[in-house]
Amino acid sequence: MRRGARAAAAAGAAPLEAGGGWRARARPVPGGGRYPAGDFCSRCGLCDTYYVAQVGEACAFLGPGMARAEALEERVHGRGRDAASDERHFGVFQERFAAAMAPPVDGAQWTGTVTSVAIAALESGLVEAVVCVQSHPDDPLRPMPAIARTREEVLASRGVKPSLSPSLEVLAEVEAQGIRRLLFIGVGCQVIALRSVEHHLRAAGLEELYVMGTFCADNGHAEGLQKFLRETSCDPATVTGYEFMQDYRVHLKHSTGQYEKIPYFCLDANTLSEGVIAPSCASCFDYVNSLADLVVGYMAVPYMQVPMTAHPTIVHVRNRRGVELLEPVRGRMVETPLEDSGDRKPFVLETLLSDDRAALGRVQAPAPLPVGEALATVLEKVGPKGLEFARYSIDYHSLRSALKVKRGFSAKHAGQHIPSYAAATFAEYDKGGALSERTQWSSWAEEEAAQVAKRRRRLDAALAALSSARGLRRFALPLLTVAALLGAVAFGAANYTG
């Protein structure tokens, strides 16, 4: 069941506020208009309805921004996260496990855990409706938010649509239909905004709100998705989904049922660094969807050499409502032990520096396929696995977002936007101020000049030390010359090898 969001906004305003009020006065952003968060807007859909009036208190990219999630955790879950535990990375949770649905849901991206939970919630009467994302009739990867009231309507939302979705555009319609018990399925930026306006929904008649989330990173606009597929796949028109797996390859699922696997190292970072990932996603700190009641995702499960449609995912149960959502389907899930091994930290910094240099404009040729395959095979054996791989991904995305925010936001806005746990991660990796220094650079030329200046200072310091050493003064100039030559050769080799 779906109507145009702006029509629903108009229809829903009068019965809610016959005497006027913010709903009646609000003016949704018109088609093609500029959204309040500008280039950093995640197109969550809030501003496409009369809820645009609440954007200042709800938007994940205005004012406190992503830090809103941290402030809301206690209200949503009954407590904030324990930053001294694994909750620093994964958010509040009371239970987590890896599992697959048995049998899997036909047509799902994975085994259909999200779909199964939504259908069970609807058919058990736990909720009256489910806000989900169906596919546009003209493009299966184009998201189309919907209010589902039947099994068939939920099944129509199977599969991941890896681009920005205006899911909150249905809020006015939810109110217009008088829905009392609702399940919302969405990603972090949407859920932050939803939780921020939840009290308005309750004032309008909503009695219970359940939120099921997915892990989310690196989405973009539809054009960015198409660019990624063109640059990555040999047959982009038949791709129905993809995932960056723990075997260090991106797995692209095709409508034929075949999988195409490309090593991370064979992706063209220079081409993909522009126009693929939305600025909002590149400045996000809620990869783990911390305000959802129940979260389902892949990133913490090692690759098990089976297709995605048979592969376990990880489930985080955050609170009582999460337990209620999961209980009806728990008996149909096959659980597998969680793995946690390796050391993420060296991999985090290498990935961050490589990607950031590409973002700054440094030309880096992708690895030839045989080299990429060899690297992926080795790293799958020696790199972080399971939960540690997830921490690697979370740390990397958090640091990348911090660099983006510190460069693109004012100092005040950046300080508001970055949650304390993300700031702690930045400080942990900012040894000697190396990351803070990077925030001052806006191009590869600036980084290159800074590195040359740093080498020159080191040489000057060495010369000064040699010059002051008794009996070594006559050797200072020859030693300096040799050091300079060796430094030049090393710098050239580093740039040549990428």
PLM ranges: what are they?
Residues 19-77, 294:
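Iron-sulfur cluster-binding cysteine motifs and their immediate structural context
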Residues 199-213:
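A short alpha->loop->secondary-structure connector
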Residues 473-498:
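Terminal signal-anchor or tail-anchor transmembrane helices
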Residues 127, 232-463:
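Long, compositionally biased charged/polar accessory segments in the mid-to-C-terminal portions
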Residues 58-114:
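Entry/capping segment at the start of metal-dependent catalytic domains
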Residues 68, 108-141:
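Low-complexity, highly charged intrinsically disordered N-terminal segments
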Residues 1-24:
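N-terminal mitochondrial targeting presequence
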Residues 215-227:
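Short, conserved secondary-structure transition motifs
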